[in-house]
Design a protein with these regions (language model features):
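Extracellular polysaccharide-degrading/modifying enzymes targeting complex plant/algal/animal polysaccharides
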Residues: 38-345, 384-389, 624-634, 643-698
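Extracellular glycan-recognition surfaces and repeat-rich motifs
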Residues: 710-749
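Short, aromatic/His-centered strand-loop micro-motif at the edge of beta-sheets
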Residues: 815-834
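Flexible glycan-contacting loops in extracellular carbohydrate-active proteins
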Residues: 860-890
């Protein structure tokens, strides 16, 4: 039974059919050199740790000088329960094996043979004290018992008392947990999805009658943060969920492993493998202290089976699974480290994780697959002071490698993640089958200074990304200033995100603050939501690309800026969906003046390009605004689109518009090794399939007055998301205070500060769901001098990532609504704010706003339309700090009611 679109895939046999991709033979070991040590299962030196200690002794004795100690690794499996740890004293070592399938560093252990029960469930004994959250059976990853077997359960209602870790479930969905004893209930894990990440929380308590479930682990955002549809979750790790082939359950009390076999498995030939070591190799360098691990290389070595423990409370969600600092191979402070013709497989968390102060690292001709999280994560500190300069990482090369099948445990893992690093190259790789992004660059939100420079992502095949599980992703995804960086000659296809809450998915995605990037000569095809997305940024260039077979829009620009955000030049946009558009995104058509578009060719193969294809405007209006003077609406004359033959026939109008043909088949692995190429071509993923449409979330009434929260706390009513994790030690925060509330005894204080990440924090959000009638929202607001609060009312239910109906701000001491000046904001005085928003009927869209300072006269304004005409429902209320200065303001007495005729 399948797992498509949820935490697991439906055909684990195909995903993990490693035998079909085995290299026929290892690469030659290169020019013969001196062998100083032989590591062999039956030799004098039998363990990797003993070999490393012997190498250290050889170097200390002076027997080896001026070159690395050569350690020949004989075929065999070398079992590690603890990682092989390199310090600076272990520099200049080379481990060389004949083949990564023959010489394997193994972090797991085999259990006793299975016995088959009459009910078809196999079992085997588990040694006392052995605890694990991953399992492999017959070399293939098995699935921890889970319900539902495919796709998701949906949370019914938010719990306002504990919005980040509690919710109300449908009673039938949690009924199987009702009879569990407390110790078994505490081991049940709740998998939670939130747009671009997911996490786990073990059950703290359950009220089966009401369906109220509380997790021990809080998620980083309120569970109903995205609220157009009900949030997703699944339940794992209890006996009643064991009901499908390939699933397993560890009965801790009975010390037994229970397993339902997959087709073709027999007890005589099938063994279970349990991971023991969390890492196989650790590089314990510290560049700031002058302790650098240098000149270490591995050739022809396999690294298999590592564990990731979800822990007694769970593990919080985080973009790119960046909160999980565990990898099969991991460390910091390395220099001249290389992996050639290696294999990293069957991991609990990331494959290779190298952090602060790692420089000149090469991964070549290496297979990285079957990953609990991401493939390769590389990056260090982003120093704002010179004292941290040693933490900067640089000069990573990932070349001619295959990185695939990630996110088995932590779906937000990325194929290759590069953050706070410069002069890196990811070239000629096959990167596929991840639930989140393929390659990521950056890791600074907004326009703050970064160390990211001259990074190159080129000639990669990146495909089958997203798989319908997460959102707000890209085949290539960037953040922050990346001056001098280039994304070129990549072939990207099938990037598809979750179709429910959260932002969509794109082929190329320049997210918050991206600047200085050039995207050229890329082929981006069949990315449902769109080919490219510019959130906000500065001077990014998309030039000479093929953007093909998208459904919603070729290009998106979300936030208007007062400078050039993006240049889109000499590209071909070609789509087949008659409802597809060339351009979409935030703001009005008039706001599109921050982009430069010219020389682009647009064509809808299903018929005429619709009149609203250019951000709601037609071609003539688009050109009248100054765009695409050299562009055209014309068939590019592809050779055979039905067969993905995107060559241009003679006379193509794309050529006269300035497009230069390029060979997208040059992307991917290279060389003469036929087996390596065949491995890259192997189809080991499932066909994409969307989850069923999630039920809508309807909440028409809300109350929040902060009275029940202790002074100094961050409230989780409505869902409060403060930048406490993202900005440790920074002054920006939320807190309940008892000084001068609008009513009662308490209010909520917002304190903004410069350089907070993300730049829209602190923030408080309220999930709701009003589609009809009149939504009546009221709250009290008090500002201090210089404060610039923003209140946004959003609709997440449409085709856009979201639309904004109302944006109320305080700027220069004045209340402004949707750009219209209203009245003065008196410092230190509470203002009662009331909005009435008709969402249906003859007055739909004609809304009103009243602001009344305490002790003063009211100011009232009527509006004929919402900020965005596509705003149709109120699903999200946000109180946001967009400011970049130190400022303070207060919120109290939030109320939402809905009137129906």
């Amino acid at each position: 039974m399948g797992r498509q679109g949820g935490l697991y895939k439906k055909d684990d046999m195909k995903r993990n059919a490693f035998g079909a991709c085995v290299l026929a033979a290892g690469l030659a070991m290169g020019a013969a050199g001196a062998v100083d040590l032989v590591l062999a299962p039956d030799g004098e030196v039998r363990t990797p740790a003993a070999a490393l200690a012997r190498a250290r002794a050889l170097r200390a004795s002076g027997a080896v000088a001026g070159r690395p100690v050569e350690i020949q690794v004989a075929p065999g499996r070398y079992h590690l329960s603890e990682p092989l740890t390199f310090t600076a004293a272990d520099s200049a070592v080379r481990f060389r094996g004949a083949s990564p399938r023959a010489a394997v560093f193994d972090g797991g252990r085999a259990l006793a043979p299975f016995t088959a029960g009459a009910d078809g469930v196999w079992e085997t004994a588990v040694p006392d004290g052995l605890v694990f959250d991953q399992l492999w059976v017959g070399g293939r990853r098995a699935v921890r018992a889970r319900t539902p077997n495919r796709f998701y359960h949906y949370m019914k209602e938010a719990d306002e008392t504990c919005a980040n870790r509690a919710f109300f479930a449908e009673a039938a969905d949690v009924a199987p947990l009702a009879q569990l004893p407390p110790d078994e209930l505490a081991r049940v894990a709740v998998a939670v999805w939130q747009s671009w990440d997911m996490g786990y929380g073990h059950v703290a308590s359950l009220d089966a009658a009401s369906g109220r479930l509380v997790m021990k682990q809080a998620m980083k955002r309120p569970l109903f943060f995205w609220c157009a549809t009900r949030p997703r979750y699944a339940l794992e790790n209890f006996r009643a969920a064991l009901d499908a082939p390939g699933e397993w359950f560890h009965d801790v009390k009975a010390r037994k492993l229970l397993y339902i076999p997959r087709e073709g498995e027999t007890v005589e030939r099938t063994r279970a493998h349990v991971p023991v070591a969390t890492s196989l190799v650790v590089f314990a360098g510290d560049r700031a202290r002058g302790e650098v691990v240098r000149d270490v290389s591995f050739e022809g070595i396999g690294f298999e089976y590592t564990a990731f423990r979800i822990g007694p409370t769970g593990v919080a969600n985080a973009q790119a699974a960046a909160n999980v600092q565990e990898g099969a191979l991991m460390g910091a402070g390395v220099e001249n480290l290389s992996f050639t013709n290696c294999r990293i497989a069957h991991t609990g968390a990331h494959g290779l994780l190298l952090r602060a102060g790692s420089r000149h690292v090469a991964v070549r001709h290496t297979l990285v697959e079957d990953l609990g999280a991401g493939g390769i994560a590389f990056g260090g500190d982003n120093p704002r002071d010179p004292a941290k300069a040693a933490g900067v990482s640089s000069h990573l090369v990932v070349e001619d490698s295959i990185i695939r099948h990630g996110g088995h445990t932590l779906q937000a893992g990325i194929g290759v993640w590069i953050g706070h690093a410069h002069d890196c190259a990811v070239v000629h790789n096959e990167i596929c089958d991840f639930f989140y992004t393929g390659v990521s660059l950056g890791w600074t939100w907004g326009y703050a200074p970064t160390v990211n420079r001259r990074n190159r992502i080129a000639f990669n095949r990146i495909h089958h990304i997203g798989q319908g599980a997460l959102s707000d992703m890209g085949g290539v995804y960037t953040l922050g200033d990346n001056a001098g960086s280039e994304v070129a000659n990549n072939w990207i296809w099938e990037v598809n995100g979750y179709a429910g809450n959260g932002a969509p998915a794109w082929g190329l995605y320049t997210d918050e603050g991206s600047q200085g990037l050039v995207f050229r000569d890329n082929l981006v095809a069949r990315c449902r939501d769109g080919a490219i997305h510019q959130h906000y940024g500065r001077e990014n260039v998309y030039s000479n690309n093929l953007f093909l077979a998208f459904s919603k829009a070729g290009a998106w620009r979300s936030r208007a800026e007062d400078h050039v955000t993006v240049r889109v030049l000499n590209n071909v946009f070609w789509w087949t969906d008659p409802d597809g558009a060339a351009w979409r995104g935030g703001g009005s058509f008039a706001s599109m003046r921050d982009i430069v578009a010219d020389g682009n060719l647009y064509w809808c193969a299903a018929g005429a390009v619709k009149e609203t294809a250019f951000k709601g405007a037609d071609w003539a209006q688009w050109r009248a605004q100054g765009h695409d003077a050299r562009g055209a609406l014309a068939d590019p004359l592809f050779a055979d689109p039905a067969k993905d033959d995107w060559r241009l026939r003679p006379g193509s109008p794309a050529l006269s518009a300035g497009f230069r043909p390029f060979d997208w088949h040059a992307a991917g692995v290279y060389g003469t090794d036929a087996a390596w190429r065949a491995c890259a071509e192997e189809r080991c993923w499932d066909a994409f399939e969307d989850a069923p449409k999630a039920p809508k979330y309807r909440r028409e009434r809300l109350r929040a007055d902060f009275e029940r929260f202790p002074v100094g706390n961050v409230p989780h009513t409505m869902g409060a998301f403060a930048p406490l994790d993202a900005n440790p030690g920074r002054p920006g925060r939320l807190a309940v205070v008892d000084a001068d509330p609008a009513q009662g005894r308490k209010a909520l204080r917002f304190a903004d500060a410069p350089d907070l990440k993300p730049d829209w924090t602190p923030i408080v959000t309220a999930a709701c769901g009003v589609e009809a009638g009149v939504a009546k929202l009221a709250f009290a607001l008090k500002v201090e001098d210089g404060a610039t609060p923003t209140v946004e009312l959003r609709d997440y239910s449409g085709d856009e990532p979201f639309t904004v109906g109302v944006r109320l701000t305080v700027q220069k001491g004045r209340f402004t609504a949707n750009g219209r000046d209203l009245c003065a904001a008196r410092p230190g005085v509470w203002h009662d704010v009331a909005l009435a928003l008709p969402l249906s009927g003859p007055r739909a869209g004609r809304w009103s706003l009243t602001v009344t300072p305490r002790g003063g006269a009211s100011a009232r304004a009527e509006f004929a339309s919402f900020l965005d005409a596509r705003f149709k429902a109120l699903t999200w209320i946000g109180f946001i700090c967009y400011g970049a200065t130190s400022s303070v303001w207060y919120l109290d007495d939030l109320r939402l009611d809905t009137e129906h005729d």
